[in-house]
């Protein structure tokens, strides 16, 4: 790859983000300032105009540019009509849970008319991350990218931004309210999108706005791919081209060249595209994003759309367009589980001198967390006094180790900080279920049919090495995201985890370093991390309907003995509940 070619190619996507480009990371200060204004904005997609929450009137929202180790100050002004919080997804926020963002976990929400200043501390992150709302389903439209360049004095060549995001043709707030009230499943979105557009396979009114990427033959581009979807894993491919993955979740990987990627909600990937079509080739190629799902498609509604954008060669070395763009024939089918697993098993940490691998070899705390879809009895939240819309008149729920998380009325971090956690949360989240459950492929995977609500947390001493094995008992994949930490994905397997046999298969040499791991249906995934970030840290499935149903818990990491191992003081401007 010729290094001289890269800089001339940076601007075809970045030029539209004028405010971000005005602060060039190569010359900017180490402290960067942004103002986010939450507002209601009218947008048209799929021939319908609707009012959505946006940041600075943009959908997707503004991109934050920084360098590794920078300090970012974001003042969020809530000019919308509802409470809101913002989470900086994948930023570890060392010693600073106060600015992590999940509502009622680390802060009370920002009320309409209020504002809150977030302090975002970048440490080891380098590559692509993103920010999003962390309240109800607001992240459907309130989200944007975080582009983290290397430290000053160092370089890397991969700099082109592309994002993959969802679009809802039904009112998001109505969808969520209905699901909460009557306990049924959440209505699926009408389409997937790439950079806010569904593509030209949808109604005529959408075609003129199809996202297009202009490329020149022989050059190499970096796609910063973000799955901001609420409920779907995605396959992504570009017709006539292979893709080289060089990073995931802002951590470098050993380069792998593939025909497609599979990316879970919440994940980010840095992917190289070589524009290698030659004279006589078509000059237009679809990049396509398609839902990957393991649910029974004949009985459960889901978004089965394929979003498209167009890669278009603009130089004379390639023929001008004749007919429609080519479609990626190697894009996997919706239920291709083998294709999904084949991709994720290839991921490895880079592991060089500048980016070493430090996998903990000795584990202090072993946890086996069963992930399941359950039910709760229909209750007074159903204002119609009719049966709920879940199976057998119940409401849908979800659980970790048969605990369906219930949000408290005040935020947990404040309660912990002031020593007033009694009555707010319980410090007894179980390390494992007492009954061994085998995945069955039924609707609730053979786990407990009915679950119980609770606000249970796991308390860890500072420096504890933790291994968590996620055991998926359900018929659906689950992207599990941990705030405050990046972890090593040391193992995967199908069926029931065997604590005597399966650890021997772990990769302790160069496992991928991630903040979100996709746990396949009826399978398991093992992660390891060192609890060296004091504070309260949320862990949850990144399917938003599962968060609402209770597939969440928290780690409370105690302060260490030195000042550098203790939480930062509480900021004076924290929102009040």
From Swiss-Prot:
<dbReference type="GO" id="GO:0016491">
    <property type="term" value="F:oxidoreductase activity"/>
</dbReference>
<dbReference type="Pfam" id="PF07731">
    <property type="entry name" value="Cu-oxidase_2"/>
</dbReference>
<feature type="binding site">
    <location>
        <position position="551"/>
    </location>
    <ligand>
        <name>Cu cation 4</name>
    </ligand>
</feature>
<keyword id="KW-0439">Lignin degradation</keyword>
<dbReference type="InterPro" id="IPR033138">
    <property type="entry name" value="Cu_oxidase_CS"/>
</dbReference>
<keyword id="KW-0052">Apoplast</keyword>
<feature type="binding site">
    <location>
        <position position="540"/>
    </location>
    <ligand>
        <name>Cu cation 3</name>
    </ligand>
</feature>
<feature type="binding site">
    <location>
        <position position="541"/>
    </location>
    <ligand>
        <name>Cu cation 4</name>
    </ligand>
</feature>
<feature type="domain" description="Plastocyanin-like 1">
    <location>
        <begin position="37"/>
        <end position="153"/>
    </location>
</feature>
<dbReference type="InterPro" id="IPR011706">
    <property type="entry name" value="Cu-oxidase_C"/>
</dbReference>
<feature type="glycosylation site" description="N-linked (GlcNAc...) asparagine">
    <location>
        <position position="304"/>
    </location>
</feature>
<dbReference type="InterPro" id="IPR034288">
    <property type="entry name" value="CuRO_1_LCC"/>
</dbReference>
<dbReference type="InterPro" id="IPR045087">
    <property type="entry name" value="Cu-oxidase_fam"/>
</dbReference>
<dbReference type="InterPro" id="IPR008972">
    <property type="entry name" value="Cupredoxin"/>
</dbReference>
<feature type="glycosylation site" description="N-linked (GlcNAc...) asparagine">
    <location>
        <position position="115"/>
    </location>
</feature>
<dbReference type="InterPro" id="IPR034289">
    <property type="entry name" value="CuRO_3_LCC"/>
</dbReference>
<feature type="domain" description="Plastocyanin-like 2">
    <location>
        <begin position="163"/>
        <end position="316"/>
    </location>
</feature>
<keyword id="KW-0560">Oxidoreductase</keyword>
<keyword id="KW-0479">Metal-binding</keyword>
<dbReference type="GO" id="GO:0048046">
    <property type="term" value="C:apoplast"/>
</dbReference>
<dbReference type="InterPro" id="IPR011707">
    <property type="entry name" value="Cu-oxidase-like_N"/>
</dbReference>
<feature type="glycosylation site" description="N-linked (GlcNAc...) asparagine">
    <location>
        <position position="382"/>
    </location>
</feature>
<feature type="binding site">
    <location>
        <position position="478"/>
    </location>
    <ligand>
        <name>Cu cation 4</name>
    </ligand>
</feature>
<dbReference type="GO" id="GO:0005507">
    <property type="term" value="F:copper ion binding"/>
</dbReference>
<protein>
    <recommendedName>
        <fullName>Putative laccase-1</fullName>
        <ecNumber>1.10.3.2</ecNumber>
    </recommendedName>
</protein>
<feature type="signal peptide">
    <location>
        <begin position="1"/>
        <end position="28"/>
    </location>
</feature>
<dbReference type="InterPro" id="IPR034285">
    <property type="entry name" value="CuRO_2_LCC"/>
</dbReference>
<comment type="similarity">
    <text>Belongs to the multicopper oxidase family.</text>
</comment>
<feature type="glycosylation site" description="N-linked (GlcNAc...) asparagine">
    <location>
        <position position="276"/>
    </location>
</feature>
<keyword id="KW-0325">Glycoprotein</keyword>
<dbReference type="GO" id="GO:0046274">
    <property type="term" value="P:lignin catabolic process"/>
</dbReference>
<dbReference type="InterPro" id="IPR002355">
    <property type="entry name" value="Cu_oxidase_Cu_BS"/>
</dbReference>
<feature type="binding site">
    <location>
        <position position="89"/>
    </location>
    <ligand>
        <name>Cu cation 2</name>
    </ligand>
</feature>
<feature type="binding site">
    <location>
        <position position="542"/>
    </location>
    <ligand>
        <name>Cu cation 2</name>
    </ligand>
</feature>
<feature type="binding site">
    <location>
        <position position="87"/>
    </location>
    <ligand>
        <name>Cu cation 1</name>
    </ligand>
</feature>
<feature type="binding site">
    <location>
        <position position="546"/>
    </location>
    <ligand>
        <name>Cu cation 4</name>
    </ligand>
</feature>
<dbReference type="InterPro" id="IPR001117">
    <property type="entry name" value="Cu-oxidase_2nd"/>
</dbReference>
<feature type="binding site">
    <location>
        <position position="134"/>
    </location>
    <ligand>
        <name>Cu cation 3</name>
    </ligand>
</feature>
<feature type="binding site">
    <location>
        <position position="132"/>
    </location>
    <ligand>
        <name>Cu cation 2</name>
    </ligand>
</feature>
<dbReference type="InterPro" id="IPR017761">
    <property type="entry name" value="Laccase"/>
</dbReference>
<dbReference type="Pfam" id="PF00394">
    <property type="entry name" value="Cu-oxidase"/>
</dbReference>
<keyword id="KW-0186">Copper</keyword>
């Amino acid at each position: 790859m010729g290094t001289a070619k890269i800089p001339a190619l940076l601007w075809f996507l970045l030029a539209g983000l004028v405010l971000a480009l005005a602060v060039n990371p190569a010359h900017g200060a180490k402290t960067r300032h942004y103002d986010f204004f939450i507002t209601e904005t009218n947008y048209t997609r799929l021939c319908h105009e609707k009012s959505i929450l946006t940041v600075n009137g943009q959908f997707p929202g503004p991109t934050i540019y920084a360098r590794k180790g920078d300090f970012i100050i974001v003042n969020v002004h809530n000019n919308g009509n509802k409470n809101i919080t913002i989470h900086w997804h994948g930023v570890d926020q060392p010693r600073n849970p106060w600015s992590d963002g999940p509502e009622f976990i680390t802060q009370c929400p920002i009320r309409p008319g209020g504002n809150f200043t977030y302090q975002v501390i970048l440490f080891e992150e380098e590559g692509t991350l993103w920010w999003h709302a962390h309240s109800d389903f607001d992240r459907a439209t309130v989200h944007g990218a975080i582009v983290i360049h290397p430290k000053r004095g160092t370089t890397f060549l991969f700099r082109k931004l592309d994002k993959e995001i969802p679009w809802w043709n039904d009112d998001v707030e109505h969808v969520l309210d209905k699901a909460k009230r009557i306990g049924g499943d959440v209505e699926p979105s009408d389409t997937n999108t790439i950079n806010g557009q569904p593509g030209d396979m949808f109604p005529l009114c959408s075609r003129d706005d199809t996202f297009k990427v202009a490329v020149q033959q022989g050059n190499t581009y970096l796609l910063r791919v973000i799955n901001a979807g609420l409920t779907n894993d995605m396959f992504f491919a570009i017709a006539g081209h292979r893709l080289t993955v060089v990073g995931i979740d802002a951590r470098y990987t050993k380069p792998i060249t593939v025909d497609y990627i599979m990316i879970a909600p919440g994940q980010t990937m840095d992917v190289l595209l070589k524009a290698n079509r030659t004279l006589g080739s078509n000059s237009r190629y679809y990049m396509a994003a398609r839902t990957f799902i393991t649910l029974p498609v004949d009985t459960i509604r889901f978004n089965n759309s394929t979003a498209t954008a167009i890669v278009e060669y603009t130089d004379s070395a390639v023929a001008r367009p004749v007919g429609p763009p080519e479609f990626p024939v190697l894009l996997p089918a919706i239920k291709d589980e083998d294709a999904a697993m084949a991709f994720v098993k290839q991921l490895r940490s880079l592991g060089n001198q500048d980016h070493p691998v430090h996998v903990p070899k000795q584990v202090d705390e072993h946890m086996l967390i069963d992930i399941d879809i359950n039910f709760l009895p229909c209750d007074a939240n159903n204002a119609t006094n009719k049966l709920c819309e879940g199976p057998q008149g119940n409401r849908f729920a979800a659980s970790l180790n048969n605990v369906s998380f219930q949000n408290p009325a005040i935020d947990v971090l404040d309660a912990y900080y002031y020593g007033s956690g009694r009555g707010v949360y319980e410090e007894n989240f179980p390390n494992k279920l007492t009954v061994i459950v085998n995945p069955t492929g039924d609707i609730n995977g053979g786990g407990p049919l009915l679950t119980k609500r609770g606000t249970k947390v796991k308390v860890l001493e500072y420096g504890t090495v933790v291994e968590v094995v996620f055991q998926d008992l359900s018929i659906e994949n689950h992207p599990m995201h941990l705030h405050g930490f990046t972890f090593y994905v040391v193992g995967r397997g199908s069926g029931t985890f065997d604590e005597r046999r399966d650890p021997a298969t772990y990769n302790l040499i160069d496992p991928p370093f991630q903040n979100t791991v996709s746990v396949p249906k009826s399978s398991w995934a093992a992660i390891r991390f060192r609890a060296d970030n004091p504070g309260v840290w949320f862990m949850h499935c990144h399917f938003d309907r599962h968060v609402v149903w209770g597939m969440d818990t928290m780690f409370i990491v105690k302060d260490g003995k030195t000042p550098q191992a203790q939480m930062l003081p509480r900021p004076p401007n924290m929102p009040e509940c």
